[in-house]
Amino acid sequence: MTPTTENFTPSADLARPSVADTVIGSAKKTLFIRKPTTDDGWGIYELVKACPPLDVNSGYAYLLLATQFRDTCAVATDEEGEIVGFVSGYVKRNAPDTYFLWQVAVGEKARGTGLARRLVEAVLMRPGMGDVRHLETTITPDNEASWGLFKRLADRWQAPLNSREYFSTGQLGGEHDPENLVRIGPFEPQQI
C-alpha cells in the first residue's frame, strides 16, 4: 500500500509530538511515521539495541538525532505509541544533492511490512528535500537486510546502485567489519 501524506505542520516545541505526516495501513496494523522528538530518544536507543547487527550509539546520540537532525530523521510508531522503526541521516553539506542514511532500524513486530523503505521515502518526500538525487549509506558485507533494502530502493526508483570499500577493518580499529559506501542515484523525486 502506498503511504498517504497528511497535512503536516512541524511543532516549534521539540518536546511536543508532531502530527503524523505519513500513515501506513495494512491488514495487520497501522503504523505512523513522523519526525522524532526529545521524548523519542531513549525509545530509539532501545529499538536499535534490539536490532543486531546495528551499531548501538549512546542514548545521548539518539537524543541529538531526535532534536538537532529531526528534519532528516523519522520514527514509526504503532497505535499504542511504541517506536517500531527509525531512520537517521542528513543531507551532506559538501554534496547537497545527497542524503546520507546513517542508520535504519525496524523492530521485530514491524518487519516484513516494507517499513524501512517507507521510512526512507517519508524523509525524502519532506519539504526541503527536493534537491536530493542520491542516497548513500555504508553497509558491512554481511548485512543482508541492508543490502536487500538498498537493492529494492534502487529497483523501485529505477536508479543505479554502486558500492566500494569505504572504511577498512584496520580503520575501524580491527574489531569491526569493513564498511562499503553504497550509493543510489541519480533519481528523480517523482520516482520515490
Curated annotation (Swiss-Prot):
<dbReference type="GO" id="GO:0019491">
    <property type="term" value="P:ectoine biosynthetic process"/>
</dbReference>
<protein>
    <recommendedName>
        <fullName>L-2,4-diaminobutyric acid acetyltransferase</fullName>
        <ecNumber>2.3.1.178</ecNumber>
    </recommendedName>
</protein>
<dbReference type="InterPro" id="IPR000182">
    <property type="entry name" value="GNAT_dom"/>
</dbReference>
<dbReference type="Pfam" id="PF00583">
    <property type="entry name" value="Acetyltransf_1"/>
</dbReference>
<keyword id="KW-0808">Transferase</keyword>
<comment type="similarity">
    <text>Belongs to the acetyltransferase family. EctA subfamily.</text>
</comment>
<comment type="pathway">
    <text>Amine and polyamine biosynthesis; ectoine biosynthesis; L-ectoine from L-aspartate 4-semialdehyde: step 2/3.</text>
</comment>
<dbReference type="InterPro" id="IPR012772">
    <property type="entry name" value="Ectoine_EctA"/>
</dbReference>
<dbReference type="InterPro" id="IPR016181">
    <property type="entry name" value="Acyl_CoA_acyltransferase"/>
</dbReference>
<dbReference type="GO" id="GO:0033816">
    <property type="term" value="F:diaminobutyrate acetyltransferase activity"/>
</dbReference>
<keyword id="KW-0012">Acyltransferase</keyword>
<feature type="domain" description="N-acetyltransferase">
    <location>
        <begin position="31"/>
        <end position="192"/>
    </location>
</feature>
